Amino acid sequence: MQIFLATTNEGKVRELKNLLGTGFEVFCLKDFPEITPAVEDGSSFKENAVKKASHAASLTKMWTLADDSGLVVDALSGAPGIYSARFAGENADDKANNAKLLNLLTDIPEAERTARFVSAVALVSPTGETTVFEGSCEGTILFAADGTEGFGYDPLFYSADLHKSFGQASADEKNAVSHRSRAMSKACAYLKERK
């Protein structure tokens, strides 16, 4: 069975291949340079994931997966949310996004720094049938970065599952409890039933 993953992220492609196991051929945007990524202008992770998957499925005619994910901080009314990657501005890097997050949480006590990573994975069939799978992982935002592993907000996110920051966790530890792997595992189980 052929699967298209609407991403250029090789890490996501490797993760999907591992979750699916044998009998699946996985393609991504790098394999189809003529496909331009969909514009992510939805108002939720789910909307953005569906837009990306539907756009790519209409062009490839393959089973297509796309995800949208980010950090949701309760004390910030859900921000950065769908703007996680560009929280400090359109071309902001991880350092700038983390600095803005810490600045906004300066006066927020530890007990009120609850947060979660959220992922929506949209799966679109070759005929356009759409199913969405969601995953999340709970934690809190630390007062300073802790660890050098991962990317994005990982050094600031203290995982309730791991009892350490994602910045201290190995890739295998993080992937065992991450929002994306939880959502993607559900999507892979669904695909295996249809193989």
Model features per residue range: what roles?
Residues Q2-F4, G11-K195:
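Anionic-ligand binding patches
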